[in-house]
């Protein structure tokens, strides 16, 4: 087990995997393709979708949005606790990413179905802009807005089922089980707080369109220059291998 963990966390091994992935991409003459997994009733997807168009403008990539449905049950040991925490977390952090999150509870299934139907019909090039509008309407409980969008973006129930099924299969094939994540050449970047790591990787590969190297997604907060306390504290660090 220790040997496996050392291999997993080895920076040398990490770089080797990246080098092989890039060599394979070049040999196959493939563009820089970034997959984005979007789940309409995932609170974190409401955050990530606000950065799609900015990301596409900043990097020379082939961007492929993929609509996904329910998570793999095997990945959720405490489903209720997980969903409750996701909602609470996004309510707390949305403003720090300059995103308005209107949700106070999870949307009704009827609205979720309409949101999926609309996005099933959306052209990939306009997915970012339409998905933002859909997400705001969904989490606001704005049925009228979703019905208005349905006039322009129509999908049959079977088309939605097939789209979500295909999206789930692609997602599962990437060893991932949720929404709100970006996937590039064997690596997953889950949520807005990890998007900068994908940006760093693409910048190293020369895929950025400008030379300013300013991140697309930046947390809107500033820590104090110095921290003072009247007494010492014990800090426990729990690293996540996610």
Predicted feature residues:
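Short loop/turn microsegments at loop-to-beta-strand junctions
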Residues: 32-34, 177-178
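Short, composition-biased local secondary-structure segments
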Residues: 20-26, 54, 58-64, 220-224
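Non-catalytic pre-domain segments flanking phosphatase-related domains
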Residues: 5-31
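Structural alpha/beta surface segment adjacent to cysteine/selenocysteine redox centers
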Residues: 40, 46-138, 234-236, 242
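A generic fold-level signal
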Residues: 29-30, 228-230
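Short, well-ordered beta-strand elements
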Residues: 33-36, 233-237
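Short strand-loop junctions, especially beta-strand C-caps/beta-turns
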Residues: 37-39, 187, 238
């Amino acid at each position: 087990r220790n040997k496996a963990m050392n291999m997993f966390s080895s920076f040398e091994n990490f770089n080797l995997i990246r080098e092989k992935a890039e060599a394979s991409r070049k040999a196959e003459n493939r563009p820089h393709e970034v997959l984005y997994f979007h789940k309409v009733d995932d609170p974190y997807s409401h955050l990530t979708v606000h950065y799609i168009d900015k990301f596409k403008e900043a990097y020379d990539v082939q961007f492929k949005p993929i609509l996904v449905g329910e998570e793999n049950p095997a990945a959720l040991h405490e489903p209720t606790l997980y969903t409750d925490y996701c909602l609470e977390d996004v309510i707390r952090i949305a403003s720090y990413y300059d995103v308005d999150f209107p949700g106070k509870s999870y949307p009704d299934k009827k609205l979720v179905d309409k949101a999926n139907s609309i996005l099933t019909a959306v052209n990939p090039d306009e997915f970012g802009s339409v998905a933002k509008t859909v997400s705001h309407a969904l989490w606001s409980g704005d049925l009228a807005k979703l019905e208005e969008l349905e006039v322009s973006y129509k999908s049959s129930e079977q088309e939605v089922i097939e789209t979500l099924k295909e999206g789930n299969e692609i997602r599962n094939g990437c060893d991932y089980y949720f929404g709100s994540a970006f996937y590039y050449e064997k690596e997953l970047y889950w949520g807005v707080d990890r998007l900068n790591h994908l940006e760093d990787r693409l910048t190293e590969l020369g895929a950025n369109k400008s030379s300013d190297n300013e991140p697309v997604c930046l947390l809107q907060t500033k820590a104090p220059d110095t921290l003072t306390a009247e007494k010492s504290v014990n800090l426990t660090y729990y690293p996540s291998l996610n």
